[in-house]
Design a protein with these regions (language model features):
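Distinct, well-ordered alpha-helical segments
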Residues: 33-44
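Carbohydrate-binding surfaces of carbohydrate-active enzymes
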Residues: 6-7, 11-14, 22-26, 34, ...
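Surface-exposed cleft-lining segments at the edges of enzyme active sites
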Residues: 1-5
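Switch I (G2) and immediately adjacent beta-strands of P-loop GTPase domains
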Residues: 18
Length: 168
């Protein structure tokens, strides 16, 4: 079942990549999470960038180094963290609890320190209603910054200061 399921996903990813490659020169990738269900090499074979999503609790950041090291080497292409949480994580409730001060800062630097070229957050602004109300963001529904917004801004300034070194 697992091999069948993996082939199904790879087939779908390849089908979508073929269509997108016809209409854009932008890099094409697919968001992945670290599970044992996929062949990451097969999934990324026709893609231009390796993308990874992670929503682990702050206590698991050390384990994320392994995931970054593994996925970054799947293909000799850019490695992007395309979804991670700015604060808490949740859909209808805040899963994994509160993030201690500094966790978002470390979560921003870690993938870059492990060879990542980009880190993106889910969500930029908190939802005013609907699904994922309990998901952290950079700004609340009124547009006010959370504590984690400053941590991300600090890392962004440091990325800018280290730009030449990080490009190597």
């Amino acid at each position: 079942w697992t091999r069948f399921h993996c082939r199904n996903i790879v087939s779908y990813v390849n089908e979508q990549a073929e269509v997108l490659h016809q209409y854009t020169k932008a890099p094409v990738g697919t968001d992945m999470m670290a599970t044992n269900l996929l062949s990451y090499e097969e999934t990324n074979r026709q893609l231009d960038v390796v993308q990874y999503n992670h929503y682990e609790p702050a206590a698991e950041l050390g384990r994320m180094s392994f995931a970054y090291d593994f996925l970054r080497t799947v293909k000799d292409k850019p490695f992007w963290v395309t979804e991670t949480q700015a604060g808490w994580n949740g859909s209808t409730f805040a899963e994994f609890g509160y993030r201690p001060a500094g966790a978002c800062y470390a979560n921003t630097w870690l993938p870059v320190a492990r060879g990542g070229e980009m880190v993106e957050y889910w969500h930029f602004r908190a939802h005013p209603n609907g699904h994922e109300l309990a998901h952290g963001a950079l700004f609340n529904t009124a547009g006010r910054a959370y504590r984690v917004t400053g941590e991300i801004a600090r890392a962004a300034k440091e990325f800018e200061a280290c730009r030449d070194l990080l490009r190597r």
